[in-house]
From Swiss-Prot:
Translated by a ribosomal termination-reinitiation process from the bicistronic mRNA coding for VP1 and VP2. Belongs to the sapovirus VP2 family. This is Minor capsid protein VP2. The N-terminus domain points away from the virion surface. Keywords: Capsid decoration protein, Capsid protein, Host cytoplasm, Virion. GO terms for cellular component: host cell cytoplasm; viral capsid, decoration. Minor structural protein that forms a portal-like structure at a unique three-fold axis of symmetry, following binding to the host receptor. The channel formed by VP2 may allow the delivery of the viral genome through the host endosomal membrane. It is found in: Virion; Host cytoplasm. Homooligomer. The portal-like structure consists in 12 copies of VP2. Interacts with capsid protein VP1.
Length: 164
């Protein structure tokens, strides 16, 4: 019977060895799977970092060229150069007739400008009021009224000169 007990112990040993070898193989496969998973995560992180860096570079390039892009877009949309610069962030101000004008489309600027003819007419009207019409009123303005002028005494004023 001892040889049966020895054979059983030998079979148990072989079963334990097979189980241990199976666990070692399984553990090695799990390590390989974890290693490939970690490598994939590292590669994804590298790709994400690369993409973030590209997006940051695009953002900086876009912001560096933003005023130029805004100006070009405004001009192509029909705004004049001053209004386009104002849209791009310029603090430039345009005054027309003593008033600050809002953003102006190129079609509106022509409507707002005064023609030289109107300015000359306005100057002629002011000149007519101050000088009169040639041939109708005297050239030196309106005549002074004729008549007696009243002398009004001023309190505290004397007519004699005193020497000090």
């Amino acid at each position: 019977m001892s040889w049966i007990a020895g054979a059983m112990q030998g079979a148990g040993l072989l079963g334990d060895l097979a189980g241990t070898i199976g666990q070692i193989v399984l553990h090695n496969k799990q390590l390989n799977i974890m290693n490939s998973f970690n490598q994939a995560q590292i590669q994804l992180a590298k790709d994400q970092l690369k993409q973030n860096q590209q997006l940051a570079n695009q953002y900086y390039e876009f912001n560096a060229n933003l005023p130029v892009n805004q100006y070009n877009s405004a001009v192509s949309a029909g705004f004049d150069s001053v209004s386009a610069r104002q849209l791009a962030g310029s603090r430039e101000v345009r005054y027309l007739g003593g008033q600050q004008t809002p953003l102006v489309h190129q079609g509106q600027i022509h409507q707002m400008m005064f023609s030289p003819k109107h300015l000359m007419q306005a100057q002629h009207v002011v000149g007519t009021f101050s000088r009169g019409m040639p041939g109708v009123t005297p050239s030196k303005g309106l005549p002074r009224p004729q008549g007696v002028t009243a002398k009004v005494p001023v309190a505290g004023a004397t007519t004699t000169h005193s020497k000090v």
